[in-house]
């Protein structure tokens, strides 16, 4: 069975742990406890193939900048996470997270993940009656950032409602499988003159 190591990075409190807990247990965590480092594992079926998916949760706080990269070796795919209701976390994708993972794992594919879309959708409804100073990140902004940083795909999701949750991890696995297919084709290609 093929194994895939998926590391999740992003600012503190953007919903990385909720994403993993909701995906692996179908339950949404009720309280926020900052993560230092945590591991989850699941056997999943993607495109009719069993995959041992190793999920690595990381600390987003600056206090852990020096130890976080210890989880990066042999990473197959990164999920760069930001909250769609936190513009600073969105900006940190290009100023901190993409440069950090590119420095340590220059060849690993990245997916850009916008979390907490349930809150954005809720705010969109309530903004009609109240004046908010912080505008949530739109899908179009996420797509533009995805292209800007060279991520393979942009996906929005909600750990609370589980909207697009399985899709996030299926696409992470597909990113690795597709790269492995391309490498096998390159290795099998042989020209004799």
Swiss-Prot record:
The keyword Acetylation does not apply. Gene3D superfamilies: P-loop containing nucleotide triphosphate hydrolases (3.40.50.300). Belongs to the small GTPase superfamily. Rho family. It catalyses: GTP + H2O = GDP + phosphate + H(+). Residues 191-193 form a propeptide. GTP binds at residues 13, 15-18, 32, 35, 60, 116, 118, 159. GO terms for molecular function: GTP binding; GTPase activity; metal ion binding; protein kinase binding. This is Rho-related protein racB. Regulated by guanine nucleotide exchange factors (GEFs) which promote the exchange of bound GDP for free GTP, GTPase activating proteins (GAPs) which increase the GTP hydrolysis activity, and GDP dissociation inhibitors which inhibit the dissociation of the nucleotide from the GTPase. Small GTPase which cycles between active GTP-bound and inactive GDP-bound states. It comes from Entamoeba histolytica (strain ATCC 30459 / HM-1:IMSS / ABRM). The keyword Nucleotide-binding applies. InterPro entries: P-loop_NTPase, Small_GTP-bd, Small_GTPase, Small_GTPase_Rho. Its main location: membrane. The switch 1 and switch 2 motifs undergo large conformational changes during GTP/GDP cycle and play important roles in the interaction with downstream effectors. The lineage of its organism: Eukaryota, Amoebozoa, Evosea, Archamoebae, Mastigamoebida. It is a lipid-anchor. A lipid is attached at residue 190 (S-geranylgeranyl cysteine). The modification Cysteine methyl ester is found at residue 190. NCBIfam families: small_GTP (TIGR00231). A motif (Switch 2) lies at residues 57-75.
């Amino acid at each position: 069975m093929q194994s895939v190591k998926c590391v999740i990075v992003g600012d503190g409190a953007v919903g990385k742990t909720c994403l993993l807990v909701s995906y692996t247990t179908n339950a949404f965590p009720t309280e926020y406890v900052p993560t230092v480092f945590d591991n989850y594992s699941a056997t999943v079926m993607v495109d009719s193939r069993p995959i041992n998916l190793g999920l690595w949760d990381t600390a987003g706080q600056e206090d852990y900048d020096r130890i976080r990269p210890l989880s990066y070796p042999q990473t197959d795919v990164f999920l760069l996470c930001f909250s769609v209701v936190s513009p600073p976390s969105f900006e940190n994708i290009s100023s901190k997270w993409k440069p950090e993972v590119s420095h340590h794992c220059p060849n690993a594919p990245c997916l850009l993940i916008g979390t907490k879309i349930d809150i954005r959708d809720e705010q969109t409804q309530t903004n009609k009656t109240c004046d908010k100073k912080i505008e949530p990140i739109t899908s179009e902004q996420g797509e533009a950032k995805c292209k800007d940083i060279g991520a393979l795909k942009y996906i929005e999701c909600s750990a609370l409602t589980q909207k697009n949750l399985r899709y996030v991890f299926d696409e992470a696995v597909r990113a690795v499988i597709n790269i492995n297919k391309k490498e096998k084709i390159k290795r099998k290609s042989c020209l004799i003159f």
